């Protein structure tokens, strides 16, 4: 055996044995896999697609839902080509209309004339996802402006049965259950006291691998805005004690930046729409976000330790509109061009500094922590070794799953990353240098 390898292995073993155990929260394997997805697609689809409303009234006739050419495989193929790893569908929005034949509701596709009452959007989408290797997720709003039980103790049991009909296996594995915290009045003018422990327990019983979204998790949290940006500082940890989803939760700042001393691992999910609204409208076909705007969102979400959930709403045909799909392909092409060539060479660690060779010009730095050991880095500096010596390029804060630092255009033979503040011994799992000639 090579002596150098033996010595290096012995040194690593000694370091591992002497390193103080990390005392902060750690992610579950499911949370690590979730954040590795980096980009998923949101599909807002339902009666609002046909009315132009964002929040339906719950009194819409079931026949209003009538997509003329539903093609969930087109959604999935589009998502896959754009680099998305999963799709979340609004199976039931606040209006109560169910995109599947929910046995405890009379406001579903079963009561519509679409496909003679035999249609099931969730079946079509889950099967398409399975065929293409894309993960399937669901948004099921507990608010129901149609169900007569809403606002009574019985409704919580009705909602559990709703969850069971989706999560019980008929549609296969569900990677994320999205709970909107909205809680308005039902048809009887009453509000509901949601039994969140019961709802969460139902999800975990039926889909134990699923990530549960809400403003306080427990799987992932809302980023605190719908504009598409996580905080420049963004911890994957959050203080959730004493909070209830949708009711006086953490401050917008805590949601956006996390809590350095957070007691639970609840990483941020950045949800934003490719259009001004969440549901499709013909009047917004000329307002789809530009590639420049989408790149900004990418850098400020994925590049700031968050997963990006980009809403791309199907139209009244039941298809992703050509304007949206074309823009997504342009966005994908831009990302592929930017990150095609990593000019970072060998890296050498000395204490809390890493020096990496630079094999060409660059203006983007990608850093990743080994988050299985926890999020540790609180601040770091970036320097480049040029003909004039070492020059500071950036001073930044957290890293987490991924941090993309936008640097000035630089030509250097080496880059040094120095962690200046951390909760414990820092561990970087990846260092990359790239040239972006697209984003301005």
Language model: regions and residue ranges:
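Sec-dependent signal peptide recognition
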Residues: 2-8
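Mature catalytic domains of secreted/periplasmic carbohydrate-active enzymes
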Residues: 18-409, 418-437
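Extracellular Ig-like/FN3 beta-sandwich strand-entry sites
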Residues: 412-414
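Conserved catalytic region of serine esterases and O-acyltransferases that act on ester linkages
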Residues: 440
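Hydrophobic h-region of N-terminal signal peptides that target proteins for export
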Residues: 10-17
């Amino acid at each position: 055996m090579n002596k150098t390898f033996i010595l290096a292995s012995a040194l690593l073993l000694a370091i591992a044995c002497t390193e103080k155990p990390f005392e902060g929260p750690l992610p579950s394997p499911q949370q690590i896999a979730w954040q590795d997805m980096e980009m998923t697609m949101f599909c807002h689809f339902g009666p609002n697609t046909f009315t132009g409303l964002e929040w339906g009234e719950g009194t819409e006739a079931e026949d209003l839902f009538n997509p003329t050419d539903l093609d969930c495989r087109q959604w999935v193929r589009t998502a896959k080509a754009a680099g998305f790893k999963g799709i979340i569908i609004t199976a039931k929005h606040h209006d109560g209309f169910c995109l599947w034949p929910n046995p405890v509701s009379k406001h579903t596709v079963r009561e519509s004339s679409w496909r003679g009452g035999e249609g099931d959007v969730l079946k079509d989408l889950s099967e398409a996802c399975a065929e293409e290797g894309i993960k399937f997720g669901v948004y099921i709003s507990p608010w129901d402006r149609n169900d007569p039980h809403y606002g009574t103790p019985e409704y919580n049991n009705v909602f559990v049965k709703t969850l069971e009909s989706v999560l019980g296996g008929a549609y296969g594995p569900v990677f994320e259950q999205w709970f909107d915290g909205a809680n308005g009045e039902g048809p009887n003018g009453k509000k509901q006291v949601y039994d969140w422990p019961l709802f969460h327990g139902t999800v975990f019983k039926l889909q134990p691998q699923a990530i549960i979204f809400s403003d306080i998790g427990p799987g992932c949290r809302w980023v605190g805005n719908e504009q598409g940006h996580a905080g420049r500082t963004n911890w994957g940890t959050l203080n959730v004690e004493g909070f209830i989803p949708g009711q006086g939760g953490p401050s917008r700042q805590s949601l956006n930046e996390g809590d350095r001393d957070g007691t639970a691992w609840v990483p941020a999910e950045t949800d934003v729409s490719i259009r001004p609204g969440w549901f499709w409208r013909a009047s917004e076909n000329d307002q789809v976000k530009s590639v420049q705007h989408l790149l900004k969102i990418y850098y400020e979400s994925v590049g700031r330790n968050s997963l990006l959930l980009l809403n791309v709403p199907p139209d009244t045909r039941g298809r992703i509109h050509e304007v949206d799909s074309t823009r997504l392909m342009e966005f994908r092409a831009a990302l592929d061009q930017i990150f095609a060539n990593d000019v970072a060479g060998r890296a050498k660690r000395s204490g809390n500094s890493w020096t990496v060779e630079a094999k060409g010009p660059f203006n983007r730095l990608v850093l990743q922590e080994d988050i299985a050991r926890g999020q540790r880095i609180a601040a770091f500096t970036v320097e480049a070794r040029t003909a004039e010596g070492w020059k500071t390029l950036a001073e930044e804060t957290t890293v987490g799953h991924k941090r993309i630092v936008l640097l000035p255009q630089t030509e250097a033979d080496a880059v040094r990353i120095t962690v200046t503040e951390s909760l414990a011994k820092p561990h970087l799992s990846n260092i990359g240098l790239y040239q972006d000639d697209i984003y301005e």
